[in-house]
């Protein structure tokens, strides 16, 4: 098969590259069909052997990356279907249009790998360049490190334990090296089997010790399951608020809080239809749903007004409300979603996708906060959790809190892929992570990424879980992306030194 792929030319080669990239997307959450990479990556290497120049390699890589991200990011079109009469015409354009520039990062990696000699030098060079371009994708423009190759292992805690050392980028490097081995022959594949067994053994050894004891806090994750179509309707504000209040009161009554402990309810991103930071009446209702000593951490819009009473700025925020209705603290989202929370190039783009008449403003971040004496945590709103190294190193928290509204994406792969990034952040930082999602998937992970409890997609209810204790400082938390960056650079250098080749 690989020999036939290497012989393809012209459009057939491009179609094959596109198909292999699309196939590779099945390795991503929630399918996790990792064996397809044993065809998709060696197939790409085979097609690369037939490329007559680095420019041809660039086009082949673009076709592979385009197919990969069209399939992997298909769920983005669901957000447009929440208002089909207004945005339905964008459905056939949005995903291919987004997938093309993202696929360009893979294209550049493939073009770089073309200069390496076929065989193991090219595989190593491809893996190194690929990971370097993944890192660049995580910071370029506003950054979009979604569906990184290392996330294919996030279906369970055991396969991702290496992220505590090398992060998800390091897992990407290992994944690409292992996936490309079939192109190198049976001996290489046998070595790959041994490597996988060794990695599994490492993961099992890291999971063997007992977790630190839980903290004296019981988290109550509240999942209101409010559909996006109803979320901002004026006539639904009170029913939605009432639903969250009732779920909180019922969950608090049923929760088993140990003596000396306290209950902390968590609502998802923008779950409150009212502005909790400035609406004292809404906070009074919240206080009535909390037990004595309890607290609510809720997603709520925060507004700033000028001296003339005119609205000046809006923030996508997390608000901490005490059982006495006092506002104990706020966090304003720092990493905003382009086109979702603000319009980039506003003067040049004639259409407006964001809701409302004003863009959201960004706050400072990342931060650690400890309202009302809670164990310090790092709040991550929505896709802030997809960025590795999302914890401030100067004020290391004791846990991570991710609140999100994935109702935009319905029953698609999007919420599952988002959840996978949360597991990876817990392992990388060695910190427990709690996640409250509007329509799911709400969950609690311990400091090694083991899921302790969850509410599934489309469920309505609450989940009471003791807050796990923090783990030891991981090498990745200590050093950050410098470890995977160094590994990727060494791989690229090794592949280059093994096969210095004249540029054609």
Segments from the language model and where they lie:
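Membrane-embedded alpha-helical bundles of multi-pass enzymes
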Residues: 1-207, 411-412, 422-425, 437-445, ...
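Soluble catalytic domains of enzymes that build or remodel membrane lipids, polysaccharides, and related
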Residues: 207-482
């Amino acid at each position: 098969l690989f020999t036939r792929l290497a012989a393809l030319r012209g459009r057939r080669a491009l179609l094959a590259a596109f198909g292999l990239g699309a196939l590779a997307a099945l390795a991503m959450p929630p399918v996790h069909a990792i064996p397809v990479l044993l065809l998709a990556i060696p197939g790409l290497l085979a097609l690369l052997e037939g490329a007559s120049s680095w420019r041809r390699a660039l086009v082949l890589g673009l076709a592979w990356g385009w197919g990969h991200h069209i399939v992997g990011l298909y769920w983005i079109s669901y957000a447009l279907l929440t208002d089909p009469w207004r945005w339905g015409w964008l459905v056939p354009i949005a995903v291919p249009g987004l997938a093309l520039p993202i696929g360009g990062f893979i294209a550049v990696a493939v073009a770089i790998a073309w200069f390496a000699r076929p065989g193991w030098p090219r595989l190593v060079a491809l893996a190194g360049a690929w990971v370097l371009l993944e890192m660049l994708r995580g910071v370029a423009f506003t950054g979009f490190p979604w569906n990184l190759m290392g996330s294919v292992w996030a279906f369970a805690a055991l396969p991702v334990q290496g992220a505590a050392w090398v992060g998800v980028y390091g897992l990407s490097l290992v994944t690409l090296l292992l996936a490309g081995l079939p192109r190198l022959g049976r001996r290489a594949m046998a070595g790959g089997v041994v490597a996988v067994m060794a990695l599994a053994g490492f993961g099992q050894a890291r999971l063997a010790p007992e977790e630190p004891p839980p903290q004296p806090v019981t988290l109550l994750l509240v999942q209101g399951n409010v559909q996006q179509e109803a979320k901002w309707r004026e006539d639904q504000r009170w029913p939605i608020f009432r639903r969250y209040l009732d779920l909180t009161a019922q969950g608090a009554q049923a929760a088993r809080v140990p003596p000396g402990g306290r209950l902390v309810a968590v609502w998802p991103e923008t779950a409150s239809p009212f502005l909790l930071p400035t609406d004292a009446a809404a906070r009074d209702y919240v206080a009535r749903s909390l037990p004595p000593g309890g607290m609510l951490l809720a997603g709520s819009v925060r507004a700033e007004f000028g001296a003339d009473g005119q609205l000046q700025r809006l923030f996508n925020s997390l608000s901490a409300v005490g059982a006495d209705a006092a506002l104990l603290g706020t966090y304003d989202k720092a990493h905003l979603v382009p086109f979702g929370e603000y319009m980039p190039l506003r003067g040049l783009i004639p259409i407006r996708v964001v809701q409302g008449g004003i863009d959201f403003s960004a706050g400072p971040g990342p931060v650690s906060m400890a309202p009302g004496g809670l164990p310090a945590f790092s709040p991550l709103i929505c896709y802030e959790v997809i960025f590795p190294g999302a914890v401030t190193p100067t004020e290391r928290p004791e846990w991570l809190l991710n609140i999100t509204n994935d109702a935009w994406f319905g029953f698609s792969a999007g919420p599952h892929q988002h959840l996978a990034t949360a597991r990876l952040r817990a392992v990388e930082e060695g910190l427990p992570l709690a996640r409250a999602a509007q329509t799911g998937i709400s969950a609690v992970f311990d400091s090694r990424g083991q899921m302790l409890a969850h509410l599934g997609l489309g469920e309505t209810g609450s989940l009471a879980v003791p807050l796990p204790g923090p783990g030891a400082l991981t090498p990745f938390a200590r050093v950050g992306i410098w470890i995977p960056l160094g590994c990727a650079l060494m791989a690229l250098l090794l592949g280059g030194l093994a096969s210095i080749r004249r540029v054609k």
